[in-house]
Amino acid sequence: IPIPSMKEQQKVVDIYIQAQVERTRRHQTAKQQLESIDDYLLDVLHVDKNQATLCSNGYVKNISTILGNRLDVSFYRNRFELISKKYSNFPLSSVAHIDPSISFRGYDVNTPISFIPMECIDEIYGEIHVIKSTTILQSKGYTKFEEGDLLWAKITPCMQNGKSAIVKNLENGIGCGSTEFFVLRPRNNNVLMDYIYLLLRHHEVLKAAQSSFGGSAGEQRVSSQYLKSIIIPIPDYSIQKDIVAKIYNMKSQAKQLQKEGDKLLEEAKQKIEKLIFE
């Protein structure tokens, strides 16, 4: 390998360290930007962010909230309710279909459709970074969904890591994927799927859902009953749109910061190569 002078070696080190420090700074700022989304949601929806954790020794519940639900303590322990002091609040099941019935009947079995396994969803931004392809013939045994549906992971650790995304640009408007997804769809045009998606990505919602896990160690899941029982505020449609636009803008800014940081480091590496080899 070429050995430049001590002065040139120090210059190389300085260039790299400076770029690495700047990249780290921008990535950290992006991380803080993403984390601030949770506080923004609670503030704009007038939800109490200082909810006390329920006492572990006992619970007092209205009989109306228990009927039809599980009776085990984990179902009610450490719940974080998105109850607004300003807007009307509803159980998730009253505003969204959860695992709606979906049939591919009427399609030719060789019709190409999208295939989305768990690993295709980015947990940081909640987006699908790769869409694979399959056919209706090969979709048997998988979770089925349609254009615009929300996929929300039910199993640990995918759920608490944020494996959720809205499916878009599906082949022929339909797809299939992991059986460990819940599929959600708005019940009417008064609720934005993007709005529900953002609420269900809130850190406290995911943390509370983790407390409700059932199943054996290593394969614990959130039950559909728990998901249906989550309370969410529903402001006017125009307010939902404003909230979604604001948060998507915050996410875009975070992405841009990360890209800038990565670009600075890559440019520094190229500069170093020129110094050493040219």
Regions found by a protein language model. Give the residues of each.
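A short glycine-rich beta-alpha junction/loop motif
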Residues: I1-K7, I174-F182, G214-S238
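Short coil/turn segments at secondary-structure boundaries
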Residues: A52-S56, R105-I113, S211-F213
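Short, solvent-exposed loop/turn positions at domain surfaces
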Residues: I136-S139, L170, S216
